[in-house]
Amino acid sequence: EASRYLDYVQLMTYDLQGGFQKVTGHHAALYHSEGNLFDACVQKAVNGFVNAGVPMEKLILGVPFYSRKWDGVKGAGCRNGLGMEAETVGGYGGDYGELKESWIGKRGFIRYWDEQAKVPYLFDGETFISYEDCESLGVKIAYLKEKGMGGIMFWEYKCDPSGELLSFIKKNM
């Protein structure tokens, strides 16, 4: 009912897993993944709002320009660290600029792609990092266009100092 008084409803579809759990996972998965133990994803959030009566065209999809990081991952060989217990909760893991400069493909970190969830993650055998990149943004932009959503928003501008993610959004929206 409240949606009739609102121009848009911004869905903060990030931090879906992280700061409150000692189990690794995607903090902004588009779809549920078998490796992600908690059933939280963009699709489920969007469906929840639509089922509650919010028109699709009023929904704005939120994406993160920062990461979530778990240290001390146990059972590292399984699923490349996804869905595994860790010593720490998934705290702030740095912004996209930091990941590009110091983590992606460096320090022993390998970039993996979860084909079910449609998001990337990094793992070095002990540390798991969930983040957003241009590939996952492309899939989310296609999703929101297909669904007829109202647009996209992000958190936050300063986390993309090179403008790579923002430029990708501008080009593809």
Give the predicted meaning of each segment.
Residues 10-13, 125-173:
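Active-site and adjacent substrate-binding regions of carbohydrate-active enzymes
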Residues 26, 63-143, 172-173:
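Glycan-binding loop/region signatures in secreted carbohydrate-active enzymes
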Residues 6, 18-20, 24, 34-35, ...:
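Solvent-exposed, flexible loop/coil residues
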Residues 1-99:
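Substrate-binding surface in catalytic domains of secreted glycosidases
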